Amino acid sequence: MEDDWSNFLEPYDQAVNELKLKLRTLRGQFKKSGNRSPIEYVTGRVKPIPSILEKMKRRQIKPKRLSQDMEDIAGVRIMCQFVEDIYRVVELLRKRKDMQVIEERDYIKTPKESGYRSYHLVVTYPVQLLEREQQLKVEIQIRTLAMNFWATIEHSLNYKYQGCIPSEVAMRLEKSAEIAFALDQEMSSICLLYTSPSPRDRQK
């Protein structure tokens, strides 16, 4: 059984590693060109087997439908400095020829009830195996550093309380999500100040 899981997950691991390399290379290309990169850093993971099994049970996913019905077995996360960078990255990914966007969820304009904000893409990505090509679904989450900090804390609390966060804590989390987003908006305003031409530049 362990070998079965290893063989099943190996292409997903390959997909995550390839995408991390490509996105980090893209970040480097921005910097070499003298432009500010909308990508701050990139992480990725393959969902642990216990988490896959738990989600299969919760969503009643049959083993033979696992690749089709579970979209986040492979996950890549892109962190950005500013909210505007998130939408720049989304556009970059939409235009790429090595993947196809099949689903988008904008939790920034429409946050989850908990306060969670992020932009989710589900893409199909081709992995070249020894004798064939395999199309895999990969979930790409794009968020700011502030959104990621909040989501990390919320995830830890969900784990601690086994998915049942006390109402008082949930209310404070929701409030802190608004504070984090206000910080993002303020940082965007500051970004506009230092990227806009100064009065001295306009006179030249």
Give the location of each predicted region.
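Long beta-strand-rich cores associated with HINT superfamily self-processing modules
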Residues: S67, C80-M187
